[in-house]
Amino acid sequence: MAISIKGVNTGVIRKSNNFIALALKIKEPRNKESLFFMSVMELRDLLIALESRLHQKHKLDAAAHLQYEQARDKVIKKMAENIPEILVDELKNADINRRVNTLELTDNQGENLTFVLTLHDGSKCELVVNELQIEMLARAIIHAINNAEMRELALRITSLLDFLPLYDVDCQDNGNLEYDTYSQPEWKHNLFDHYLAVLYRFKDESGKEQFSGAVVKTREATPGKEIEAITRRMLDFSPRLKKLAGVPCQVYVRTV
């Protein structure tokens, strides 16, 4: 049976300065409570889906957006009145079988987003998030991470929500290409519309001209501030391209 949300609470499990998991506790309409533990990867996947729907709402015309905000605020108020308590013991003695191993967005068509969570013990749970609940849920997740003094982690996660890395590449002196592939599930591909090829032109330590590049999938096709920001953030994501951080580059972007 699908889990619907009446209220949510979050907390971070950490060991020294290392993030272990985020505890997500959900109060359902009949006041039943469900507790899940999510790693960074699963949190990122959840937030990618949530942010994609928020992006759609931000593109509404003024009247429709106002109507959405009014309805959202009523839902947020109700959720704030139904925050479930997370007990310290639930964090100290976290049940590993409640750890989310994978998360998949299976329905993104109507007012609800439906996720299938595969847990550590192999069982599956269906989680339904209404679009009016998205901001409250996302806010609770980021607040918990920031509250655990892990702001850098929050920034790292949120910097990867508006594009999908697919390839990064170095052009070798002999003309060959050395590249890495980032496999992405179909449901993530469906959140983005445009393939962009990015070429970084720079000089190495000896002053010789070099080229590196990437292929990403984005929501925007036209180069602008959003795409420019993505080309910078790709340097932080990619181990291959990290060497370009702080290096003067000419960047070329083309729709594939």
Residue ranges of predicted features:
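Extended intrinsically disordered, low-complexity coil regions enriched in Ser, Thr, Gly, Ala
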Residues: R14-L66, E111-R156, D204-G246
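A eukaryote-biased signal for long
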Residues: L166-V256
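Negatively charged, low-complexity tracts enriched in Asp/Glu with abundant Ser/Thr
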Residues: L60-I86, R151-Y179
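Intrinsic, low-complexity N-terminal interaction/targeting segments
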Residues: M1-I20, I76-F115, V169-S206
